[in-house]
């Protein structure tokens, strides 16, 4: 029996599909061609070696977490615990800062009031002299009266008020008695030698007085 000659010079058997030759050709490709193509793709994408290494590490981490779900759950629990601790620390610091602000504001106000009281205390002798001049009729008119009125207006605007008038009930905390002419338990101010002053609720100076009996008792 005669055989059919292969006029194309290849080794295909009759009826064998042509794509078998393509597979054989792939087997004979140079192994260095594939990496060269990959390198060309990397260069065209603008990636360097460090970026590729970071991407590989990221993919490795994803693969590891996928392979071990328990590790991911543990890490999440740890992060939640750390977040709770940091939240508590932040709340504590916030409360401490609020207390610090309140304390410093309070101390600042006390310092301001003390400074005002010191300055006003030095003005009180001037007010005493002006009041004495007014009793003698020297402030009925003229520039001295205008000065007195302006000074009184300023100190009153700062919350300063005078106290101590004849007939007021004696108060040992606010009145300094230089003489006691009373005969009973009820004591009032008989003579006011020097009025006292206070700034709001702060005592600037006590009033200097002579104690006497109430008017009805004296009769």
UniProtKB/Swiss-Prot annotation:
Region (Disordered): 1-32, 59-87
One GO biological process term: protein folding
Name of the molecule in the record: Protein GrpE
Domain of life (superkingdom): Bacteria
Alphabetical list of PROSITE patterns matching this protein: GRPE
GO cellular-component term (any): cytoplasm
Gene3D superfamilies: 3.90.20.20, Head domain of nucleotide exchange factor GrpE (2.30.22.10)
Gene: grpE
Family: Belongs to the GrpE family.
Gene Ontology MF terms: adenyl-nucleotide exchange factor activity; protein homodimerization activity; protein-folding chaperone binding; unfolded protein binding
Signal peptide: none
Protein function: Participates actively in the response to hyperosmotic and heat shock by preventing the aggregation of stress-denatured proteins, in association with DnaK and GrpE. It is the nucleotide exchange factor for DnaK and may function as a thermosensor. Unfolded proteins bind initially to DnaJ; upon interaction with the DnaJ-bound protein, DnaK hydrolyzes its bound ATP, resulting in the formation of a stable complex. GrpE releases ADP from DnaK; ATP binding to DnaK triggers the release of the substrate protein, thus completing the reaction cycle.
Matches recorded under InterPro entries: GrpE, GrpE_coiled_coil, GrpE_head
Keywords attached to this entry: Chaperone, Cytoplasm, Stress response
Locations listed in the record: Cytoplasm
Chief place where the protein resides: cytoplasm
Pfam families: GrpE
Oligomeric form and interacting partners: Homodimer.
């Amino acid at each position: 029996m005669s055989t059919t000659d292969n006029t194309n010079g290849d080794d295909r058997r009759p009826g064998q599909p042509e794509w078998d030759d393509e597979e054989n050709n792939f087997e004979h490709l140079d192994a260095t061609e594939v990496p060269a193509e990959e390198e060309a793709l990397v260069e065209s994408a603008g990636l360097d070696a460090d970026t590729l290494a970071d991407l590989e590490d990221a993919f490795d981490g994803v693969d590891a977490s996928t392979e071990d779900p328990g590790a991911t759950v543990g890490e999440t629990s740890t992060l939640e615990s750390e977040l709770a601790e940091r939240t508590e620390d932040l709340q504590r610091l916030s409360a401490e800062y609020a207390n610090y602000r309140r304390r410093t504001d309070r101390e600042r106000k006390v310092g301001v009031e003390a400074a005002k009281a010191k300055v006003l205390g030095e003005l009180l002798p001037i007010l005493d002299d002006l009041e004495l001049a007014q009793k003698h009729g020297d402030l009925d008119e003229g520039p001295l009266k205008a000065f007195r009125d302006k000074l009184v207006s300023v100190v009153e605007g700062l919350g300063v008020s005078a106290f101590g008038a004849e007939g007021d009930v004696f108060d040992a905390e606010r009145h300094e008695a230089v003489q006691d002419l009373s005969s009973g338990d009820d004591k009032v101010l008989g003579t006011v030698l020097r009025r006292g002053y206070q700034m709001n609720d702060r005592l600037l100076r006590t009033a200097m007085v002579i104690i006497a009996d109430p008017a009805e008792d004296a009769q």
